[in-house]
């Protein structure tokens, strides 16, 4: 029996499902920031984790049957998404502690929404990282908090923004290492 089944369709399907779940989590976080409080039950994050495990299994099966550069790309892609999902879990936990409103919350909410809207395999995310850097700089230039409570809230916001930056930076780094070569190769096929 020389036929070796391909799991390419399953890999592509689960890739889309993972990106959809990540968008859903980011949009929920944006909503929590808009409202000023929120409780994340972690259900979507759990489904995301299951999808990442499913992807890992399909890539393993594909590697057993067809060891190609595409399989290496897939493996690294899902590892990057796994690292991002860990950051989403941290951010969700931190958001559960959030009870604040203010201009910064609206700005941060919009950044989470923008990140969700731009989340895609082929997006380099370099423009998004620049926007987050600008936002961090704007937060640094704001007047210092006057009370301990304001200080703690500002620190939470700043930490959340830094975690979002790390989330996006993982994609930027991945694309610089793997995406440029992979999408160039795919483009040459057409």
What are these regions (language model features)?
Residues 2-74:
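Non-transmembrane accessory domains of multi-pass membrane transporters/channels
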Residues 14, 21-37, 47, 72-190:
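Soluble C-terminal extramembrane regulatory/interaction domains of multi-pass membrane proteins
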């Amino acid at each position: 029996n020389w036929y070796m089944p391909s799991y390419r369709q399953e890999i592509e399907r689960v890739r889309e499902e993972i990106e959809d779940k990540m968008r859903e989590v980011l949009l929920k976080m944006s909503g929590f920031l808009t409202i000023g409080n929120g409780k994340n039950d972690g259900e979507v994050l759990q489904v995301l984790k299951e999808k990442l495990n499913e992807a890992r299994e399909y890539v393993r099966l594909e590697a057993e049957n067809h060891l190609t550069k595409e399989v290496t790309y897939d493996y690294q892609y899902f590892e990057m998404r796994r690292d991002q999902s860990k950051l989403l879990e941290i951010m969700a936990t931190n958001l559960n502690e959030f009870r604040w409103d203010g201009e910064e919350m609206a700005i941060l909410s919009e950044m989470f929404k923008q990140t969700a809207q731009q989340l895609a395999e082929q997006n380099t995310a370099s423009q998004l990282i620049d926007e987050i850097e600008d936002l961090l700089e704007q937060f640094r230039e704001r007047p210092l908090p006057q009370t301990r409570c304001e200080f703690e809230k500002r620190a939470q916001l700043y930490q959340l923004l830094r975690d979002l930056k790390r989330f996006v930076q993982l994609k930027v780094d991945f694309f610089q290492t793997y995406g440029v070569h992979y999408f160039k190769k795919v483009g040459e096929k057409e």
